[in-house]
């Protein structure tokens, strides 16, 4: 059983976006719960809170005791069934962090000027650039930095493709002026084939100050630059490597009718029939 669990776990953790599925009634499913948990946290899986429409992120950054997670924006903690990706047991949650002001509290100065929080600035960035996405800002475990997460999913199984965009950043709250992180893009296309795109782009951003608006504007620029870089790469591949691989017809100059493959000599040879 252990080898079966290990094999199944590896399939789960390597599943493309939106394709970590289970079958009802399988005795092995409970043993795979740890693999589903690792998958959900790594992929920034999103779940809907009970009675809410907005999806929130599940990750290692917002995990608390008791296999629960918290969402800063809604000030809620919740449990997760990692196999079904369902949230439950929502409770009020108050963030305790020395960086709470930077994360989600808008500070008004004596001159009555409002300093936006990272969460507010990130929400604006997400609304402008990602039609459907979830985001979060969380303190790191030692409270020396802040984690910024954004995930956008697009599932189109009827058209045989699914995709996910993730970005993860670490913002130090010391004197450092560099935000480090990564952008990950995963796309799976599986109509009449199996094509996958998996990218991992390291990001290092110099910031002039620990200001929410400045940090998010630099992040937005980095994400825009990377998307443009991907677009250029797609064009080059389509006009170069992929074009050279493409063949409209096989060498026989006739299309293979796969549903009639038994009628071909090769099909008959394989099935033990006579060749023509």
Curated annotation (Swiss-Prot):
The keyword Cytoplasm applies. Signal peptide: none annotated. It is found in: Cytoplasm, Cytoskeleton. InterPro entries: CapZ_alpha (IPR002189), CapZ_alpha/beta (IPR037282), CapZ_alpha/beta_2 (IPR042276), CapZ_alpha_1 (IPR042489), F-actin_cap_asu_CS (IPR017865). The keyword Ribonucleoprotein does not apply. GO terms for molecular function: actin filament binding. Disulfide bonds: none annotated. GO terms for cellular component: actin cortical patch; cellular bud tip; cortical cytoskeleton; F-actin capping protein complex; incipient cellular bud site; mitotic actomyosin contractile ring. Its main location: cytoplasm. SUPFAM superfamilies: Subunits of heterodimeric actin filament capping protein Capz (SSF90096). GO terms for biological process: actin cytoskeleton organization; barbed-end actin filament capping. Keywords: Actin capping, Actin-binding, Cytoplasm, Cytoskeleton. F-actin-capping proteins bind in a Ca(2+)-independent manner to the fast growing ends of actin filaments (barbed end) thereby blocking the exchange of subunits at these ends. Unlike other capping proteins (such as gelsolin and severin), these proteins do not sever actin filaments. Heterodimer of an alpha and a beta subunit. Belongs to the F-actin-capping protein alpha subunit family. This is F-actin-capping protein subunit alpha.
């Amino acid at each position: 059983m252990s080898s079966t669990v290990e094999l199944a776990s590896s399939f789960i953790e390597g599943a493309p976006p939106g394709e970590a599925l289970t079958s009802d009634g399988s005795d092995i499913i409970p043993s795979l719960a740890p693999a589903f948990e690792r998958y959900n946290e790594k992929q920034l899986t999103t779940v809907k809170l009970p009675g809410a429409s907005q999806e929130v992120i599940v990750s290692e950054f917002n995990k608390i005791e008791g296999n629960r997670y918290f969402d800063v924006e809604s000030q809620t903690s919740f449990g997760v069934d990692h196999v079904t990706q369902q949230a439950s047991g929502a409770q009020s949650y108050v963030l305790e962090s020395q960086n709470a002001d930077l994360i989600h509290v808008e500070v008004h100065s004596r001159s009555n000027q409002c300093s936006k929080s990272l969460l507010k600035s990130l929400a604006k960035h997400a609304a402008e650039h990602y039609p459907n996405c979830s985001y979060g800002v969380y303190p790191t475990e030692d409270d020396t930095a802040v984690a910024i997460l954004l995930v956008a999913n697009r599932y189109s199984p009827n058209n045989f493709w699914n995709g996910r965009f993730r970005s993860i950043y670490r913002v130090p709250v010391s004197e450092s002026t560099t935000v480090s992180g990564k952008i990950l893009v995963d796309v799976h296309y599986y109509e009449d084939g199996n094509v996958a795109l998996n990218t991992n782009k390291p990001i290092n951003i110099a910031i002039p100050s620990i200001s929410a608006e400045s940090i998010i504007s630099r992040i937005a620029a980095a994400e825009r630059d990377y998307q443009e870089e991907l677009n250029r790469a797609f064009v080059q591949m389509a006009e170069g490597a992929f074009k050279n691989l493409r063949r409209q017809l096989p060498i026989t100059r006739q299309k293979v009718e796969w549903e009639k493959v038994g009628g071909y000599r090769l099909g008959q040879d394989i099935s033990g029939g006579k060749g023509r």
